[in-house]
Amino acid sequence: MPVRIPDHLPAAEVLESENIFVMSETRAANQDIRPMKVLILNLMPNKIETETQLLRLLGNTPLQVDVDLLRIHDKESKHTSIDHMNTFYRDFEAVRHKNYDGLIITGAPLGQIDFEDVVYWDHIREIIDWSQEHVTSVLFLCWAAHAGLYHLYGLNRKILQQKRSGVFVHRRTSQHFPLLRGFDDEFFAPHSRFAEMDVEEIRQHPQLQLLAESDEAGAYLVLSRNNRNLFVMGHPEYQKSTLNEEYQRDLSQGLDPNVPQNYYRNDDPKADAIARWHSHGSLLVSNWLNYYVYQLTPYDLSDMTAMTPWESR
């Protein structure tokens, strides 16, 4: 099934060239199917690139998805035109009264800044709090995962001396969660961050479940026991070139970054990168959307109390 996007969104041309099924709002209006309504809070600098990455994953699922793009209303984007933002993005006040099947909150280049010092932290907290009553399931990515664990569950992160960048092997910690259906025993996922969460604190928290971890990269998948919040510590949405682009950017800024691990062939930054995580990323988002959104969300979104708990399925 397709992902439904606004008419003329730039990502459409890229996705269609990759044989990803997308549908314009005009075309979708002629179908009598209840789509999944997903809101994306895009905090990444390059909005169009991140839109494309996330829509690529949503477009590979068997469900029709109706996407709204959300911005922090008083924060200008330095890397995306005002025209694009005004055309395709909504302010929170425009969606506050609505309910959604799913919410995706992206990462942000804020890894070394205390949460309380982030300029728009109050807005992030407000949106997270709102989501707990207005969204069936929330997918937090990278920085947003740390922010969500801090705000909702009081967990603190540890700032790393060096940026953790690369593609790392992960393992499931359980066989029994619908989110992990189809996962290999070990799988790859990319990371790009300056902080990490304490694995033992996650394990000991009564409201959280650790579903996947890595010896090198630490906690990766964490699910709240009420199934509402999924925290992904890495970037399964990244395209093949993203880690290289970040590495080259850091080099150009004189930051002396470490070479992304397990990413370039033979760990040589002059060689080609190897994408080992795309199938995992597609399966992760597909399972989330199917098992934690579609199968739990009420048909009538105006009644969020009608969510179906897993125990009754």
Curated annotation (Swiss-Prot):
Gene Ontology MF term list: homoserine O-acetyltransferase activity; homoserine O-succinyltransferase activity
GO CC annotation: cytoplasm
InterPro entries: Class_I_gatase-like (IPR029062), HST_MetA (IPR005697), MetA_family (IPR033752)
Keyword hit for RNA-binding: no
HAMAP family: MetA_acyltransf (MF_00295)
Family listed: Belongs to the MetA family.
Official protein name in the record: Homoserine O-succinyltransferase
